[in-house]
Each structure stands twice: as C-alpha cells, then as structure tokens.
Amino acid sequence: MAQTPSSTASTEVAKYVQTQNGIPPSNPVSSAMDPYHACSILQQLKAMYDEGKLTDIVVQVDHGKHFSCHRNVLAAISPYFRSMFTSGLTESTQKEVRLVGIEAESMQLVLNYAYTSRVQLTEANVQALFTAASIFQIPSLQDQCAQYMISRLEPQNCIGVFSFADHYGHQELKEKAQDYIRKKFLYVTKEQEFLHLRKDQLISILNSDDLDVEKEEHVYDSIISWYEHEQETREMHLPEIFAKCIRMPLMEETFVEQIPPIFAQAMPINRVQKGKISANCCTRRLGMTASEMIICFEAANKHSGKKQTVPCLDTLTGKVYKLCKPPGDLREVGILVTPDNELYIAGGYRPSNNDVCIDHKAESDFWLYDHSSNRWLPKAPLLRARIGCKLVHCCGKLYAIGGRVYEGDGRNPLKSVECYDTRDNCWTAVSLMPVAMEFHSAVEYKDKIYILQGEVFLCYDPPRDYWCYLTPMTAPRVQGMAAVYKDSIYYVAGIRGNHRVLTVEAYDVEQNRWTRKKDLPCEQSSNPYIKLVVFKSKLHLFVRATQVSVEEFVFRTSRKNSLYQYDEIADSWKKVYETPERLWDLGRHFECAVAKLYPQCLQKVL
C-alpha cells in the first residue's frame, strides 16, 4: 500500500526524534563481502592474458620478445609502470613500449606474479628476477627472491650474494649474507669469490666481533690471501685494513715475530709490539669464546617442578649454562649435532595436561638452533610425525629414522625413514627399514648409517637406498647407546631380558666383527642412567646415579651426575668430572648431545 504524504512525514519525524534522543534509527541496509571476489577477478584477468583478450599494451624486452598484457594490471603491481602510463609522456599513449636490460624469462615471471601472485624461483633465474623487480619497484617480489637466496646460502655463493645485495641496497639480504660469511669464515676464505671483495666490503666483514674464528691469525692469513690476489693495486690499502681489522694483542707473540717486514711495516708500530699491549684491551671474536659443552635435554630444574630446562655443562670452567628449551616444551625429540656444529631437533610430543594420559600425540616439528640468538628456527616439518626418532647426518643430508606413534590399536614402532635436504629445506621418503624400530641407536660411519636394536643390526647405503643385515652383537640387548670412536662402533649398556646390564661391545666395521670389552664401572644398586658421547675427541659416559642413605630411620636419596672417560688401551673407564651440584633432575628419558656453544649467548645458571 502506498504511503500518504502525512505518513511519510511521520516516519521522518520519528527518525529525527530517535536521533535527538541518542537512539540510532534502524537501517535495513547491510554490508557483505565475498572473500573469493579478488581471487576470482585475478583468475579472470589471467585467463584474458593467456587468451590475448582486451590487452592494451605490448611490452618488448631483450632479444625482441613481446608480451601482450593489460595496462591496469601492470600499473597496479608496479609504481614504475603506473608512472609510465599516467605521466603524460610518450609511453603513456604508445601501444608498445620497449624495456632495455630486462630478460624475457624475468619479464614472463614478473607477469605471472602480477596475474597469479605466484612465482617459480630457481638458482638460475633468481638474481635476474630480483633485478627486474628492483627496476619495476615491486618490493614484495624482491623480498621473495631475497628469501630464496638466503635459504640457499653456502660458502661457494655467499660472497656473490653479499656483493649482489650490497649493489642493490637490499639490507636484509646483505646482513644475512654477511652473517653467514662470519659464521662460515674459514670455509668462505677458501673460495675464489673471497679474493674479489672490495676493500670496504672486506673491512666490514673482518672488523666484526661476531667472526667465528678460534685464532686471530686466521684473520691475518685471510688479508694476506686477499692482498696477494692483486698485489699492485691492493698494497696501498694494507695499513688501513690492518689498523681496522687486526687485533694484535690476540695473536701469539711467536707468530707476530715472524710476520714478514713488508706486512709489519704496514702495521702501526705499537701494534707490532704485542708485549706492550694487554690482550684484555681487545674484544675477543665470537669464535674465540666457543666451548665444547655437554647439553642435557629433558632435564627439570629442581626448583620448578616438572618444567623442562636444557642445561649445558662446561667442564673446562665448571660453569653451567641454560640453552633455550625446545618450542612448545617438546619431549623425546630426535637430536643431532652435525659436523658443522649445527644443532637440530625433530619430532617428539608435547606434554598433556592430563597426567593419566600416556598415549602422547606425535609431532612433526623440525627445528634448527641459532647459536647467536639462543633460539630455535623452524624448518620444514617431517613427512611423518614421530616420537623418539633418531637423527643422523650422512653424505651431506639428514635422516630421521624410526621412532613410534600412538595410533589405532595403541603404540606402534615405525619402519619409515626420511631424508632432509638442507639446501631445499624439504624431506623425502627413502626405503623402509626391514623392521620397525623404537628405542634404537643410529650412527654414521664412512657414508653409511648403522642401526642397532637387540638382535637386529642394519646398515643403510644412502646412494643405493639399500638396507642390509650385519652380524648382530654377541650379547643382544635393547635400549643401549651407540657411538663411533676410532674406527669402531661402541654399544654400551641396555636391557637384556628383564634386567639392565652394563655390557660393552665394539664393532670393527672393516672386519665385520664384534669384540667384548670390560663392563661399565657403575654399581647396579645406584640405578644408573647412562648416555654415551664423544666429548673432546674422547669416548665418555655421562652417568646419573642415585644414592640411598638412611638418616634417623629415614631413607634419603641423592643423585650425582658424573663423567667417565674411556681408555681404549687399558680398556677401562675413569671418572674425570663430577657436577658441583645437582642443579637439575634428569629423568629416565634424558638425552645428551655435544656441541660447541658460545657462553655469552647463553643464560648462566652457575
């Protein structure tokens, strides 16, 4: 029914009264948004680009390659093109524009990114694409290229990436490359690219406190190598480089005395007289502070209930430090320290709030420890979640082996094995083990992986992706510990039948033969929990022992953590260290790893 003029007026009056009284008038209009609208438009624009429909500009790049596309898409993604098409200059009205210095593949990738938001990067195209993104002022694409280059830094290319980032002024890429150079300094100086650094670039690297070198002499040697590559043009720079980069008090006096006159003359006279300057006046490089420590995972601080902590024991100074605990309080993780001193953890489980629940959910987490910041960096997750897997470094790659999950009918050990490529940050499955494994041991020796558990002794050949059985140990047992020491695989302790044993055996890989050694020097009554590690190039046992005493008819327990060193000639173990105080509780599942750590980056607890 149509409204009369009076009814319309009444409605307007009512709205006015509501507004005056602070009551918003009812509004039947609502706002809605389609979350797929933008994607749909992008898909349609890409379809028209592929079909050559409604295109209004042709872009010509190097070698005469032409691309028909849409002005509005180019202008939307790139301030460079927006300015070109809206400035009123000649290009704004032309049907075709020519771009010099842009490769056809790079232009194709830029257009794919503009129309799809996706880009396929490779080592062959990333720098050319970064250059194009820089010219077209597309920072989001530049950042993707930068992250790709950061993820693939290695001694062979880091100098080139550093120089490339320096040229284009990309600060994050430059800093990451520079950090990598400092961390891998001794490897980088062996590369030809190091000799092509500019003077200012060389100084920016060598004058840093974060240089990972154990001796200042390495810094001096790198300068001499750089100088000798172009002696005539670089001799004039030596005084400045020595003055800004060499910390003479940190060098051995005998080394300083043997410096050739041509280089000694380039150094300030008072700096050559090392004896007159105290080493305390110079800040030591980061690498000079490194100390090999024993890291204990799954420890609990005695003052914090069950809260996990990761103590690190420096036996040289007697100090204890604390490493950042695994993210989300992960337990029973696979642990690995690579030959390059990179610390990884994988899998595990996160404790449940329900103390009754023992069927823990397996996790697929994979983390790399960053020494300088004392934090864990996320990496590509495992293909298969697993608890208690073993991590092994072999042939330049990492392997996650076995473990267990709680699925279906309960607890299930795993046969699966996966391989991690550090350059591509990805996992791939490899051949299954012949038998499922949990609570096993895994070690690497001469590019092969050895798995031990009870009567099963397996060998894996990564290049052939092949498993084979080897001669089992003479006293088969489970839940023992294995380590490689002086061309033999040692397997110690474990459970045989229902009894814990302290048996030690050594396997000669070349002879395919097991040899029985003397038992461990631990008292069974002390209920010892034992971990086997190679520490300071020697085979060691880390032992948690429990002692029971009676005081006034009250039983009291105390625990001691001790370190025993093996003498292979005498076939004996000697206690070489005892922790000054029990700062933490080591449960049944504690694990030990050995790595070089930087005390200044850790939290000191004793």
From Swiss-Prot:
<keyword id="KW-0206">Cytoskeleton</keyword>
<feature type="repeat" description="Kelch 5">
    <location>
        <begin position="546"/>
        <end position="593"/>
    </location>
</feature>
<dbReference type="GO" id="GO:0005819">
    <property type="term" value="C:spindle"/>
</dbReference>
<dbReference type="InterPro" id="IPR017096">
    <property type="entry name" value="BTB-kelch_protein"/>
</dbReference>
<feature type="repeat" description="Kelch 4">
    <location>
        <begin position="488"/>
        <end position="534"/>
    </location>
</feature>
<dbReference type="InterPro" id="IPR006652">
    <property type="entry name" value="Kelch_1"/>
</dbReference>
<keyword id="KW-0810">Translation regulation</keyword>
<dbReference type="GO" id="GO:0014029">
    <property type="term" value="P:neural crest formation"/>
</dbReference>
<dbReference type="GO" id="GO:0005794">
    <property type="term" value="C:Golgi apparatus"/>
</dbReference>
<feature type="repeat" description="Kelch 2">
    <location>
        <begin position="397"/>
        <end position="447"/>
    </location>
</feature>
<dbReference type="Pfam" id="PF24681">
    <property type="entry name" value="Kelch_KLHDC2_KLHL20_DRC7"/>
</dbReference>
<dbReference type="GO" id="GO:0006417">
    <property type="term" value="P:regulation of translation"/>
</dbReference>
<dbReference type="InterPro" id="IPR011333">
    <property type="entry name" value="SKP1/BTB/POZ_sf"/>
</dbReference>
<feature type="repeat" description="Kelch 3">
    <location>
        <begin position="449"/>
        <end position="487"/>
    </location>
</feature>
<keyword id="KW-0677">Repeat</keyword>
<keyword id="KW-0333">Golgi apparatus</keyword>
<dbReference type="GO" id="GO:0006513">
    <property type="term" value="P:protein monoubiquitination"/>
</dbReference>
<feature type="domain" description="BACK">
    <location>
        <begin position="158"/>
        <end position="258"/>
    </location>
</feature>
<comment type="function">
    <text>Substrate-specific adapter of a BCR (BTB-CUL3-RBX1) E3 ubiquitin ligase complex that acts as a regulator of neural crest specification. The BCR(KBTBD8) complex acts by mediating monoubiquitination of target proteins.</text>
</comment>
<dbReference type="GO" id="GO:0031463">
    <property type="term" value="C:Cul3-RING ubiquitin ligase complex"/>
</dbReference>
<dbReference type="GO" id="GO:0014032">
    <property type="term" value="P:neural crest cell development"/>
</dbReference>
<dbReference type="InterPro" id="IPR011705">
    <property type="entry name" value="BACK"/>
</dbReference>
<dbReference type="InterPro" id="IPR015915">
    <property type="entry name" value="Kelch-typ_b-propeller"/>
</dbReference>
<keyword id="KW-0880">Kelch repeat</keyword>
<feature type="repeat" description="Kelch 1">
    <location>
        <begin position="342"/>
        <end position="396"/>
    </location>
</feature>
<dbReference type="InterPro" id="IPR028764">
    <property type="entry name" value="BTB/POZ_KBTBD8"/>
</dbReference>
<feature type="domain" description="BTB">
    <location>
        <begin position="55"/>
        <end position="123"/>
    </location>
</feature>
<comment type="subunit">
    <text>Component of the BCR(KBTBD8) E3 ubiquitin ligase complex.</text>
</comment>
<keyword id="KW-0963">Cytoplasm</keyword>
<dbReference type="Pfam" id="PF07707">
    <property type="entry name" value="BACK"/>
</dbReference>
<dbReference type="Pfam" id="PF00651">
    <property type="entry name" value="BTB"/>
</dbReference>
<comment type="similarity">
    <text>Belongs to the KBTBD8 family.</text>
</comment>
<protein>
    <recommendedName>
        <fullName>Kelch repeat and BTB domain-containing protein 8</fullName>
    </recommendedName>
</protein>
<keyword id="KW-0833">Ubl conjugation pathway</keyword>
<dbReference type="InterPro" id="IPR000210">
    <property type="entry name" value="BTB/POZ_dom"/>
</dbReference>
